[in-house]
Amino acid sequence: MLNLEEYFPFPLDDFQLEAIRAINSGNSVVLTAPTGSGKTLIGEFAIYRGLSHDSRVFYTTPLKALSNQKFRDFANQYGENKVGLLTGDISINREAPILVMTTEIFRNMLYGEFDEFDDPLENLESVILDECHYMNDPQRGTVWEETIIHCPTRTQIIALSATIANADQLQNWIEKVHGPTVCLLYTSPSPRDRQKSRMPSSA
């Protein structure tokens, strides 16, 4: 078990602790929380956990610019040798344990369209789907659907968003198509009632 104080030397909110417990229990997580509330920390925990297990973690975003920014942030945080980047026109350290990419790139991996890899999904502990509200996009939403449907069931899905409106429906759907129980947690924008969580009865 990871020592949380070693990685996060500050008090965590209840919803963050709930999400961390869910990940440690082997569940996937759907987390919708307001911007600035600390939901990115959950993705960082999944990365720390994967590194501690000598496993890989993929961090996906909908935009090349956001992927580039996350790559720079993670390279500063974890070290350049541990972080790679894959977008449509950039490939850096693609065998790194932390691999940042656009969601379309991950979808293509799931369809076996990356022959130059021996097995890019081998030892993949978790995949973080940042800005997962793009699933509701009429033009690109199918990319997220295909990603979740074809993601190996042994791999935890960490879906993060500030704005997804039907998070409970997304939770139920992921439970059906992906396998592991998904834990849905979200925070209220009210500072007096910031934490609200819903755990599936099977958890």
Residue positions per predicted region:
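Dynamic helix-loop-helix/coil hinge segments at AAA+ ATPase domain boundaries and subdomain interfaces
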Residues: 2-15
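Intrinsic disorder/low-complexity segments enriched in polar/small residues
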Residues: 6, 17, 45, 196-197
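Conserved P-loop/Walker A NTP-binding site and adjacent catalytic elements of P-loop NTPases
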Residues: 14-160, 171-173
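Compact soluble domain cores
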Residues: 163
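Conserved H-loop
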Residues: 166
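A short helix-turn-beta junction within AAA+ P-loop NTPase domains corresponding to the substrate/partner-engaging
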Residues: 174-184
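Conserved small/polar residues in nucleotide/adenosyl-binding loops
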Residues: 186-191
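Hydrophobic alpha-helical segments, chiefly the membrane-spanning helices
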Residues: 197-203
